Amino acid sequence: MMDFDERGPCSSNMYLPSCTYYVSGPDFSSLPSFLPQTPSSRPMTYSYSSNLPQVQPVREVTFREYAIEPATKWHPRGNLAHCYSAEELVHRDCLQAPSAAGVPGDVLAKSSANVYHHPTPAVSSNFYSTVGRNGVLPQAFDQFFETAYGTPENLASSDYPGDKNAEKGPQAAAATSAAAVAAAATGAPATSSSDGGGGGGCQEAAAEEKERRRRPESSSSPESSSGHTEDKAGGSGGQRTRKKRCPYTKYQIRELEREFFFSVYINKEKRLQLSRMLNLTDRQVKIWFQNRRMKEKKINRDRLQYYSANPLL
């Protein structure tokens, strides 16, 4: 081993981990205060640089906010103290590895401005020995990993205000699309709540209204038969539509619609007259008028709901 005089060029890098020569305590009379002889008398001084005034001590951040305190204290938008403390914890973990390989822990100080102490190496090694579910960071960082990638159980039990606002977006979109699909299947346009939630409901209602206006008074088409046998296709043409059951001919529907246009409720004499003229039973005419009244009521309700949800129209 070389003499101390030949170790002069390395004296400036004496406290860096890359230095291969280590100086014991008794070699210098003016030894710095951060290299004491006994581990129990190490001072707990955290001297950070002046550009990080808001950083908390490493030990407090480690055992108070990462390990013991619940996750509700962590807000997604805070000051940058958590970022700095996380970096220092990573440096602390990196500095601890050479000391476990046989390097004395007293000389592993970086500089007089940024000093990293290891007051409790056993507790710290246990804290970082368990790797989290992402395979790189410790288990303490699992809460941030789950928040970033949206685990279902984390989204269900999250207390972050940002996550609550963020999860309203996909849920509202899913509810809007589900309401639109259900409306297309049952023949009704989307409700006013889905109109307010997204543009899908407005498009569905607009398509329904255009289709209704395209049929001239729903008079001469077989699609305008009894309401309980009707299955509308809606605005989406990609869905498979069931073949409509229509027990009435076009001539019968035209005459029934003409009578319904003059009087919504039909009396018994007129009903018997229609049944004889159209070769239908009295019960068939009666049921057709009942279904046609329900259909008209539903059309008026949907039209009122559509225009009340869109005040500009």
From Swiss-Prot:
One of its GO terms (biological process) is single fertilization. It holds the Pfam family DUF3528. GO terms for cellular component: nucleoplasm; protein-containing complex; protein-DNA complex; transcription regulator complex. GO terms for molecular function: DNA binding; DNA-binding transcription factor activity, RNA polymerase II-specific; sequence-specific double-stranded DNA binding. SMART domains: HOX (SM00389). Residues 207-217 have a biased composition (Basic and acidic residues). InterPro entries: DUF3528, HD, HD_metazoa, Homeobox_CS, Homeodomain-like_sf. Belongs to the Abd-B homeobox family. Sequence-specific transcription factor which is part of a developmental regulatory system that provides cells with specific positional identities on the anterior-posterior axis. This is Homeobox protein Hox-A11. It comes from Mus musculus. The gene is Hoxa11.
